[in-house]
């Protein structure tokens, strides 16, 4: 693979990560959010896969395949099951920040990410380093989602976005994350999603809803 093609494809993957994050902020349908997470996982997996193919590095290719399986298939499937079990609430409740304001804040966070990471890009410009601002933007957007969404599944989606952004930053800044490290991190995330799914199910059975704002009202 030529450097020109590699650069274009990495930019597409990084752009896909940010686009999926912005669409998750925009959407309120929980099923759509899960599908977008799956697409974001595929965009994340493309980064080590492309690097492995270009460098003929089988370990990186294996990491990319593992990321694709876990982030684009297994974890979204677990979240989809949690959403499917809640037939009465397929949409996110009114968030703390409305959609228009959320999109404006997301744009601001993206610009902030590019400003913060610009010194890193200038220090050692390169094909993958140039895409680091996009990965860091995903981290900031994920933190915003986690603090403004009220549904347990939406907050779990924000947590997965955060992990995707951190993993993308690691893939872009280094020569690649060793397979055992990536598997360990992914298994931690998998465990967290399983726990969130179990807790969401129990909240739904006991209180009839998994909306955290409504649960606070019950407590009060």
From Swiss-Prot:
The lineage of its organism: Bacteria, Bacillati, Actinomycetota, Actinomycetes, Mycobacteriales. This is Uncharacterized protein Rv0085. Its main location: membrane. It is found in: Cell membrane. It comes from the Bacteria. It is a multi-pass membrane protein. The chain crosses the membrane at residues 6-26, 33-53, 59-79, 103-123, 126-146, 157-177, 179-199. One of its GO terms (cellular component) is plasma membrane. Keywords: Cell membrane, Membrane, Transmembrane, Transmembrane helix. Was identified as a high-confidence drug target. Signal peptide: none annotated.
């Amino acid at each position: 693979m030529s450097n020109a093609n590699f650069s274009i494809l990495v930019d597409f993957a990084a752009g896909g990560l940010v686009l999926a994050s912005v669409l998750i902020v925009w959407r309120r349908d929980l099923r759509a959010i899960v599908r977008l997470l799956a697409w974001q996982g595929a965009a994340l997996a493309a980064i080590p896969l492309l690097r492995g193919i270009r460098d003929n590095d089988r370990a990186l290719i294996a990491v990319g395949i593992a990321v694709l399986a876990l982030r684009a298939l297994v974890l979204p499937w677990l979240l989809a099951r949690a959403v499917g079990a809640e037939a009465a609430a397929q949409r996110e409740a009114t968030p703390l920040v409305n959609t228009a304001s959320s999109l404006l804040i997301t744009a601001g966070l993206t610009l902030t990410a590019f400003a913060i990471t610009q010194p890193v890009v200038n220090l050692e410009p390169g094909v993958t380093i140039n895409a680091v601002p996009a990965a860091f933007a995903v981290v900031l957007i994920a933190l915003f989602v986690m603090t403004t969404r009220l549904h347990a599944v939406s907050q779990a989606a924000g947590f997965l976005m955060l992990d995707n952004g951190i993993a993308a930053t690691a893939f872009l800044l280094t020569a690649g994350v060793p397979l055992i490290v990536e598997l360990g991190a992914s298994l931690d995330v998998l465990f967290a999603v399983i726990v969130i799914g179990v807790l969401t199910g129990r909240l739904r059975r006991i209180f009839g809803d998994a909306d955290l704002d409504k649960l606070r009202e019950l407590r009060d």
